[in-house]
Amino acid sequence: MASDSDTEEFFDAPEDVNLSCSPAVSPLKSETFILKEEATYSKKAETRNIELKQDDSKEIIDSIIEESQKCSDTENENPVVEEKTEVLHETLIGDSVKTKQDLLSNIPELVVTESTFHDGVEDPLQQQISEYLEPDISRSQDAGPSADSAYVPSAIENIVDLTQDLKITEELKIAEEPEIPLIQEETKDPSKNIVEDVFSKLPTSDIIEQLPPAKPPRQICVEPDIVASTKKSGPNRPPQPINAPPPRPPPPARPAPPPRKKKGDTDFDRSSGFEYQKDGFLAGGLLSPNTLTENMNRDSQPSLDLASATSGEKIVTAQENGKAADGQLSSQSSECLGPQRPRSNSGRELTDDEILASVMIKNLDTGEEIPLSLAEEKLPTGINPLTLYIMRRTKEYVSNDAAQSDDEEKPQSHQSETDGGKLKQKTTQLKKFLGKSVKRAKHLAEEYGERAVNKVKSVRDEVFHTDQDDPSSSDDEGMPYTRPVKFKAAHGFKGPYDFEQIKVVQDLSGEHVGAVWTMKFSHCGRLLASAGQDNVVRIWVLKNAFDYFNNMRIKYNTEGRVSPSPSQESLNSSKSDTDGGVFSGTDDVDPDDKNAPFRQVPFCKYKGHTADLLDLSWSKNYFLLSSSMDKTVRLWHISRRECLCCFQHIDFVTAIAFHPRDDRYFLSGSLDGKLRLWNIPDKKVALWNEIDGQTKLITAANFCQNGKHAVIGTYDGRCIFYDTEHLKYHTQIHVRSTRGRNRVGRKITGIEPLPGENKILVTSNDSRIRLYDLRDLSLSMKYKGCVNSSSQIKASFSHDFTYIVSGSEDKYVYIWSTYHDLSKFTSVRRDRNDFWEGIKAHNAVVTSAIFAPNPGLMVSAETSSEKQEGDQAEPVENIPSGALKSDHTEVLLSADFTGAIKVFINKKKNIS
């Protein structure tokens, strides 16, 4: 049924101003014209009748019946109509079904014609019907109003007579046309049968052809639909081709995002914070290429195996994941062209001196700009190539004087000089000089004897700078390994000291050529990986674990053969691999040195990188990742001698990290500003994201909260957090001081998570180490004392997270307590820790310093060897994870700019 709105639109439809009323014509001409128009526009009427609603047609038919009955009582019969009725009756009996359907399409035209004649001028269809009644203007003007009144009743009279005479053929029509009874059953109105008989007996196409041609219409226009004329019509669609393929199905609707979970009672209202869980961290899923989420339980954690690591391609590019970024393609194409030497305005190629003089770099501390050719004198000593590369890209550097300053008074003195306060500057310098003199005298008095001699020797080396050019000038040469090292503590820290009795037990110098940039222990604590400037990864193994890993290598049948790999230089290990399998656990070291925990010769060497190595990462099952300045990440395994896979990047790879729960994935941060989560078995980038900002340089990366979030550090001093499941942005921290020269963010060099306490340790190039609470992103503690202005030095925790260790550019190893021992201090600021302990055992910049994760394996070297002789300890293949653990002993390793690696053991005094 039609709605109320359709009915209102029908009666309230405005008249069409483009249609004009036509004068009336004679009944004969009117009938002839109507029949001709029905045949001409039969096809168009069929289309209109389909769209015509049944309810609207019923209302029109009812009005026609009522008016026709009134007129039939007063009007006489017309003989002309009777003759045509007989012809129509004889013709309709023999018509086909197709002709009947064509005749039914002309129903609205007769209906409109009759209703228009009766309703008069105010009928809204008057103007539309006038198009079909082509007038003779001259005759209508001569006839006048009397002619109009004579023709109109006669037309109505003829239609009524047709309906009465055609009742005879109703039964025959019902038998031939099954569609008409359906309409009658729906309407169930007996009065409508008359109109249906009229429509069924309309003239056929044969009769219309015999009629004389009518006058062509003045305006060719189809009869509009009554309801559609009041509505906005849609655009006309072109006809579909015959041999056209079927239309493409519509695309599936995009699924709606899942509803957000309501925050629980333990969630923090601060949007930038992290969720805090008392019972540890939830083992959430990690997005994989095959499934959206992969729920992993703590008991059954997936891990990487050799079969999946070695399957597929050996060289993986970052562009394999569906054109990850446009910038990658453009940068790669630009690198293929190669660097072009700059030229002068005349076209002459510039010399090296001219190029260096044209590049201006800015000192971040003083704001001074100097040519790059003069910057070598002011750069800090022991600067790494990564810092030099970043300096060329950012045109910024930090002077050597600023690197040695631990306080925030130096920039203030420069400001006072510009303001004319020279007296204040001299007073400050005098206080510094007197303070240092008193401090030196005090230390000399305390370190009487051997310590005083060591102090003089170290001052001599610093004056003549012999330690940086000649590694053999170490103070440890010819000295026993168990001698005490130089120790110092922060001013105002009165003790007791925890590392005052620390000793050097082994020196692994002589293997690395050049600086050692990174060192990492395996999860079990029996393997040490070191890498740096000589492009080689070296694996060191404990003496008591050598047989275990040697048997592992033999078990996998990799001794003496290599697997196929695209790069021949990455296949063969160094000769030390073959030699290492011949010697026993103690034949390769000095027999007098029983305290040395490591074998003096590396267990294996991995070659394949073509530039400095910057970072290392171990998995739980002895896979090793190495990142380099050659823009690649290589995958190794302790049982294999060849590179298992090579992951290519666009720029230097500064940081890598295995996922802590699923080591099939690893995170990589690059100087191209992109953070990538790699899928090792599928050999592709599973997820990636790009940082924003002026300097898009990622300098550190790691996982936190047991892999729930990934965090990166940037060159401009930001720590940006992403959820690992989709690698979407979560929040960020600006690592900087509120005042002083460190109010501008400096490069982040290291990020280490603190398990169990929902905190991270951040190292930056402002010579500060900060501990942040991830629950509210607040600063829990700031550690001062070390010098780290331009290096890639990073701090780390001890095995029980009670201490923090870091290298330094002033050749010391610095150690802090993670939290203050309030029994040692009467009044102390809880969020500042200036009470450090320093160890001097190197004569160059200490580039890396780490604690051993399982010190019990190294400390008890003497006791374990004695027990193995007497009690025949357990087989070497089954090594317990926490054997001989000592709660009061720490093992510390440090490496310097010259390639020296030293092992320290510290036994704390038992306090009863």
From Swiss-Prot:
Stretches forming WD repeats: 511-550, 608-646, 648-688, 693-732, 743-782, 787-826, 841-880, 882-912
Compositional bias ranges of the Basic and acidic residues kind: 264-278, 410-422
Pfam families per the UniProt record, alphabetical: WD40
Gene3D superfamilies listed in its UniProt record: YVTN repeat-like/Quinoprotein amine dehydrogenase
Subcellular localization(s) per the UniProt record: Cytoplasm, Cytosol; Cytoplasm, Perinuclear region; Endosome membrane; Golgi apparatus, trans-Golgi network
Biased composition (Polar residues): 288-311
Region Disordered: start-end pairs: 206-352, 399-426, 460-481, 559-594, 861-882
InterPro entries: G-protein_beta_WD-40_rep, WD40/YVTN_repeat-like_dom_sf, WD40_repeat_dom_sf, WD40_rpt, WDR44/Dgr2
Keywords assigned by UniProt, alphabetized: Cytoplasm, Endosome, Golgi apparatus, Membrane, Repeat, WD repeat
Location (main, coarse): cytoplasm
Annotated Pro residues bias: 236-258
A GO cellular-component term linked to this record: Golgi apparatus
PANTHER family (alphabetical): WD REPEAT DOMAIN 44, WD REPEAT-CONTAINING PROTEIN 44
Role summary: Downstream effector for rab11. May be involved in vesicle recycling. May also be involved in the inhibition of the intracellular ciliogenesis pathway.
Name the record gives this protein: WD repeat-containing protein 44
